[in-house]
């Protein structure tokens, strides 16, 4: 299975990955942060076969096996703590927050902003970074800190909520690596970020 991480972006020793579930209309959570719809039952029926390059699309376990750091926002961190199941050990979690202080559950580190998180990643010799949470993903994309996106589309329209993507200063071209159909009709698709190579 070719699920290796892409090469790091310019000036970085680590590759950045977005891995998330999204509704068909582009939301990662309802307005109040609820994500229960991600596991809601869908009508039974024959699913379409996986598309080209299905073997290149990592599942959650494969992703965790090739990252050593996870950066998420405070709201995402607190939502995971509420669930009561911590799936990230032994990955080092960094929480973006200007309000959290003192030791955090599961040894999570706190960075006040994105630039501080990047400095922390560099100082710790990170090799693979997983970006999670809407605002965090959007900030990482704007800062050119994402090299690959693995997006699982859930066959459900929720009509509004927290969007996966936000404003960008310029278009971000992507290269499709593969797609595969999961249980319940979900489709997981992997893209690599394409960076223009300077001719000069």
Language model: regions and residue ranges:
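Enzymes that bind and transform nitrogen-containing heteroaromatic metabolites
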Residues: 1-200
